Amino acid sequence: MARPPPLPGLVGRRSGRAVDRAIGWRLFLLLWHPALGAQARPPRRAPGGRWRSRRVFLLVRRTRAAAYAFAIRRGVVRVVGGGGQLRPAPGEAAGEAGVAGAGLEAWRHPSGPARTQLEGQEGAGGWLVVGFLLCLFLLMPP
């Protein structure tokens, strides 16, 4: 089955806040829109049975969107397709360099070599890891 074409405008030549706004809005529609299903909405209770704060949920959502936007702008990952999924690039083995296995897409930038590692890509990987760790820390019950 052929893969759908990438969403237009996710990776562009613009820089700064314009890219962050465009990427953040598309990521919001991809990952958090209620039409995507129950998994896109915050659960009513945390796994430990305690009520999860909406403030924490919003902080996690903003952190995730910022981490993805930073990584996409640096050329580490790219969002393709629809349905709120980040898919492996064609020709990449599942889990290669730990990127596809982490739910992110390894891809080849038109102007440079293949970027398939989260660490060592002009600092973008480190911040992406920090963002994911922060999300995990905030989602864990006390």
From Swiss-Prot:
Signal sequence residues: 1-40
Membrane-spanning residues: 124-140
Disulfide bonds: none
Cytoplasmic side: 141-142
Membrane topology, Extracellular segments: 41-123
Keywords: Cytoplasm, Membrane, Mitochondrion, Nucleus, Signal, Transmembrane, Transmembrane helix
Tissue expression from the record: Widely expressed in the adult with highest levels in placenta and testis. Also expressed in a number of embryonic tissues at multiple embryonic stages.
Gene Ontology, cellular component aspect: mitochondrial membrane; nuclear membrane
Membrane topology per record: Single-pass type I membrane protein
Keyword Cytoplasm: yes
Cellular compartment(s): Nucleus membrane; Mitochondrion membrane; Cytoplasm
Protein name: Taurine up-regulated 1 protein
Phylogenetic classification of the source organism: Eukaryota, Metazoa, Chordata, Craniata, Vertebrata
